[in-house]
């Protein structure tokens, strides 16, 4: 009582006050560090990949399940999924590959039939185990579409591109036909994953792995030619920037592609089918039997409307590109050349 009346504090109270003051100072000093730590975590590759996966999964889930049928009014997806089930049944019964007898009066008769999406159909088999085939097909299509876009996003994060989530939004929102085709239940989405894997191997210069990758690509989809083209462009980039011929990427990719055609249940008929595809689809106007609309060009205004965002990005890339000898510029040069090739292909054939 005497201490209170005299205006002094007990020793314990003074010590507590001093300790509290020290704690406040320490907390104030630690706050910026905690904020910096949180920012570092949010910008870490793991956090960026998780955020991107959630965004991609949500967008494609909404698109795929916004309709009761397989998106998007395309009948090919039903064929692909049903054939995957027939492959599984053939494996179980020892009749592999099974006989395809749905179109006996065409080049797809049982004798000449070739499954040029063979590995893609094998990868679809687990989704045929659903009691409701349509649900299984939609989930499988959703997963492959997600993997396609996520692989592109992963490459952005891997290469430490600034603001990868912004670029992801640009990828998802740049073209309605792109979203349309990713939701069609075809092998295109798988081909994007394999292409990104190939580009990553170019960048890391792990060329030997290109052989098994090309082998898998040739078994999965006949657009393996895109990987061959990318390998050729990378060889050119190295020749241009380093003044030396780096032959390994192109040789490994070509060798793997040939092996994928030879070590194939449909060999040698798959070579004949490849030739027929090249002839009829590269010159569709010379045949009375037309091919699918995806092999015809857009009109000019359709092309500009569908690819406006991508074309704007291409223009900015052309203007800002700096041709130097650095490794980063080599990578940028490859992507610039390859995207230009795809743009020109899309001008001629809308499927690209």
Which residues make up each language-model segment?
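Juxtamembrane membrane-water interface segments that cap and precede transmembrane helices
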Residues: 101-105, 118-126, 272-305
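Membrane-interface transmembrane helices that cradle and orient dolichyl/undecaprenyl
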Residues: 195-209, 310-328
